[in-house]
Amino acid sequence: MAASEKISDIKSKGTAWILGVLAAISISIVFVLSQWWGREPQQFNILESAISQAGLTASTPAEGEGTEGGEGEHGASTETASYEILAADLPLGYTYSATLAHIADTLLNKSGGYITNDVAPPGVLLDNITSWEMGALVMLRDASTALRNHFSRDQSQSGEDPDLAIAEPYFYYEPNSWALPATEAEYEKGIQALHKYMERLRDPSKGKKAQFYSRADNLWQYTEVVIKRLGDLSTRLSSNASSSNFAPGLTNLELEEASGKVAAKVGWMEIDNVFYEARGASWALLHILRAIKHDFHDILLDKRAMRTVDIMIRELENSLTPTMSPMVLDGNGYGLFANYSLAMANYIARANAAALDLRDIMNRG
């Protein structure tokens, strides 16, 4: 009797030990995957991306050029010049469209793939990167809508491009659908339709010639949307501060009178999601603005608005500075700890101020 109890006790302890080891291994795997999948994607070169999608190849520097002492600034400048030469052969609007396709592709194929619709660990636990994806997705949707409704149409009475009419709705598919159909499958269809539009931009023989109009009124209409997006992000980022609201030149009372209500305070458990949503939106908008700077180059020079776009780009670049803490710090005033959300709100507010200037410049005759 005692012997059987002893054997049973040993078996139960062995089972518990095995289960404990398996649990420790599982937790370790989930932790490692969480660190890998939770990384924000790196920035990319919009010209290099457009050239790659067009099937062009950058020329290699001749022997002796960019080799000895060429690595570094000279090598980088040579490579950039090579991209600019090749990009000059691309039709107007190709770089902008290729940038949207690259942003969508990054959402699907970054570390861990698209995570918002995951139903199992570790993806279901990663709320920061899912917020990042939502921020980037909103900017992608706005830019694809602008391409369909404004940039590709000559007048309000003009017919819309057939491929863009297919591409845009796919990007508006619900972001958290796991299956039947999966979100990734729908977004992939949007990318494919966008590529068909890009092919017709380069080669009219592949169907009805695609159009892209880089006009001031088109850019003005898109800038209106950007202003609203940035304003919303700036307000939500700063709403957890002691002053409850943040806007240059406005007091709390003036803000309440202007909006007609008191802005809800975002709690500490939610502000990290808003912070990463703003990071994702800034990442996507940064690349879109670089593409606009390229494809709207002539109109921006003519309107003397190039510096305004550069200010927006610089502030968004600053907003993407790597954080030193694994947690979103929520300090106050001149306290010991930084306040990441207020720092981000400051950069976005300055980018929004430049967007207001850009809208006014584009709206002038």
Predicted features by range, described:
Residues M1-I18:
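N-terminal positive-inside, membrane-proximal cytosolic segments immediately preceding the first
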Residues F31, Q35, R39, F44-A54, ...:
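A cross-kingdom marker for long, charged
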Residues N117-N128, P181, V262-D272, S325-A343:
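A cross-kingdom feature marking solvent-exposed beta-strand/loop segments within repeated
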Residues E184-I313, L320:
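Extended amphipathic alpha-helical interaction segments
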